[in-house]
Design a protein with these regions (language model features):
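Short, conserved loop/helix-junction motifs that constitute active-site signature segments
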Residues: 80-81, 133-139, 160-164
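Active-site phosphate-binding strand-loop segment of PLP-dependent enzymes
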Residues: 108-154
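Short, conserved active-site loop motifs that form the nucleotide-linked donor/cofactor pocket
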Residues: 61, 140, 166-167
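PLP-dependent aminotransferase class I/II
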Residues: 23, 169-214
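N-terminal "arm"/small-domain region of PLP-dependent enzymes with the aminotransferase-like
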Residues: 1-41, 49
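Conserved beta-loop-alpha segment that forms the PLP phosphate-binding cup at the N-terminus of a helix
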Residues: 43-44, 57-84, 94-96, 185
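Glycine/small-residue-rich loop that forms an oxyanion/phosphate-binding "nest" at active or ligand-binding sites
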Residues: 67-77, 81, 127-128, 144-161
Length: 214
């Protein structure tokens, strides 16, 4: 997905970036970002724009420094409120398990018994709809990773819009935009989780997004 100590790989088969390259409009916005000053610490305009894009109230938008940062933050929150078990997909982004281990959450095969449930739709690396949902979506903290939703070529999401309103939805646009070097992400909180959204906002560092992420 990028360079390592050996530099940029000649052939990279692990990349999760859009194969079509960077989106010209997004790239121009990043290049013109004002890096001489801090962003609005409340990110008022950004939250309003994302809320309008998803047709939700602004309080439901929780900004994050990256998908990985949000994964660690919500794992910490689940642990702090007494959760102890996490359900992971068979094939999944490694930071789900990394964050769980860091915060003492134990893997749980029973999706209906877990306190934190991770799902990716479409799934990576299969590109197929996620399977193995809890019987009651609202019972646990369920995070639906939508990183690859904009790259879906056919088919429909596994959950209806009403069902998605019952879970956390995490987005990291840098992948679909072909700009993986820009670290920025956000989540849409469940419609019933205003206090949880406020708690996760409170756990974020100041200026969680830099100018390029905004």
């Amino acid at each position: 997905g990028g360079p390592d100590a050996g530099g940029v790989a000649l052939h990279d088969f692990s990349t999760n970036s859009n194969a079509c390259g960077p989106c010209p409009i997004a790239l121009a916005a990043v290049q013109s970002a004002d890096v001489t000053r801090y962003p609005d610490p409340q990110y008022t305009a950004l939250k309003a724009a994302l809320a309008a894009h998803h047709s939700v109230e602004p309080w439901r938008v929780v900004l994050a420094g990256s998908a990985s940062e949000f994964i660690f933050r919500i794992s910490a929150w689940v642990r702090q409120k007494g959760g102890s078990r996490v359900h992971l997909p068979q094939h999944a982004y490694g930071d789900y398990a990394h964050a769980a281990q860091a915060w003492g959450l134990q893997p749980c095969a029973d999706v209906d018994a877990a306190d934190l449930v991770w799902a990716c739709d479409p799934a990576s690396p299969t590109g197929q709809n996620h399977t193995g949902w809890p019987q009651v979506l609202e019972r646990s903290t369920l995070v639906l990773d939508g990183a690859y939703a904009p790259l879906r070529l056919s088919g429909e999401p596994a959950l209806t819009a009403q069902q998605r309103d019952a879970v956390w939805q995490m987005f990291s646009p840098n992948k679909a935009l072909g700009l993986t070097g820009v670290r920025a992400a956000y989540a849409i909180a469940p419609v019933h989780a205003q206090s949880a959204a406020a708690a996760l906002d409170a756990m974020a560092p100041s200026w969680v997004l830099g100018a390029h992420g905004v």
